[in-house]
Curated annotation (Swiss-Prot):
It is found in: Endoplasmic reticulum membrane. Its EC number is 2.3.-.-. The chain crosses the membrane at residues 20-42, 48-68, 71-91, 119-139, 153-173, 197-216, 229-249, 254-274, 299-319, 355-375, 387-407, 432-452, 458-478. Glycans are attached at N43, N342, N413. It comes from the Eukaryota. It is a multi-pass membrane protein. It holds the Pfam family GWT1. Keywords: Acyltransferase, Endoplasmic reticulum, Glycoprotein, GPI-anchor biosynthesis, Membrane, Transferase, Transmembrane, Transmembrane helix. This is GPI-anchored wall transfer protein 1. One of its GO terms (biological process) is GPI anchor biosynthetic process. GO terms for cellular component: endoplasmic reticulum membrane.
Amino acid sequence: MSSLKERKEAFVSGLEGGSILEINVVTSIALTSYLCANLISYNDTQNIPLGIDFVLNWVAMLLSFTLYSQDIYLLTTLCLIPSIGWFLLNYKRNLKQSKNTVKHTTKEAVQKFELTKKPFLTAYRSGMLILTCLAILAVDFQIFPRRFAKVETWGTSLMDLGVGSFVFSNGIVSSRGLFREKMKDKKDKASSIKKIFAATRSGTTLLILGLSRLFFVKNLEYQEHVTEYGVHWNFFITLSLLPPVLVLIDPITSYIPQCILAMLFSTVYQLFLIKDDSLLTYLVLSDRNTFINANREGLISFVGYCSIFLWGQTIGFFILGNKKTTNNLYKCSVTVSRDKKNRTLWDRLTTVGPSLGLLIWFIITYALSEGLYLIHPQTVSRRFANMPYVLWVVCYNTAFLLCYSLVDKLFGNSSNFYRISTLLEAMNCNGLAMFLISNVSTGLVNMCIPTIDQNDKVSIVILLIYAAFLAMVSFSLYKHKIFIKL
């Protein structure tokens, strides 16, 4: 009879995923929750009550890929109807508030470029983090549909998208550092050596976490899925290596934009995958008799994650600032665009606001994705982070960020009128720390409970307690102004 460890490993192995359409529909519940929160709080300067906040942003997300995975439209309706009803009941006050909001937002007269916090970006990042933290435990229960778990090699799934989205989000955040460096005087700018040292130091913490996870997995009989990253590799190690590796190409980005480098990395890698079957044969079938062979998935997929990270930086160039800057569609610029008459056609085309920039990049990456499939119909592979996977992740995230930004436009939210629910703000402030806590919590639950043997009722109770625990921890850290930077 198989051991519990072997049964759990078999439970997450050999999976083929589901459709991209279903993944889009399921994850749209986070967007629906953000819309509902704005409907409920539209006539009030205070945030929505914590109980409603938790139901919308944690419980609804959990239900979307468990109990309501087959009835996602019903769940969406259950969220929307009460929210719209509340909004309509307070219509007169909402109308008055709308006029006040317009007056408030038209007073923006800041001419200097500054980095600002955008409600839609906080909502997007927090929603993605919540989904990721919930899914890493839920996947170990029978209540979590197997089509949402990570695929073995080829295909798309909810969790495969979550991994890439996490890297993409980190890329957006990292572009803040590029802006800060641009805004410094020449004498205050860090040297290349200092940048490399700082990037290595920031990655060291994550590397220690990755090695710690490896130690506990190997010594506590925790289930392993070797084809995910390899024998010794894990996602924390990938995250730890991104900053020090990508800081090495910073000097190049002065001449070649991040988006071009991202495409170059993906294209060259993809050509190796499709032109010569020997590489693909090695990746899929080779023995794991050396360190490189044992961890080939983690090593080879790093190219794809570098590309995703660079795409995230590109998006950050036009969504993080308070003003449109020249050529911000593709480069880090702090030059505020003012004189429209004297701008060249190229400057006019590549100087964009958040919504337009997101729309442009969505169209471009979607067209590239479709064109690539026509040239060579290799499907998505998160295991190898191939070009179809990279373009899928970028296309999805730009589309959803665009939808979030449109919600902000609809309700008059901006950096000057920053309105976001407390639990989303709390999650955003300690995102990486909460991801670590969720990983540790998942391990503890798995060691204490045979998750694979629990029925649906017990499973959902455990997952709700887990969700409440994570929400409480993030809220407590936020309330006490504890911001953990890893």
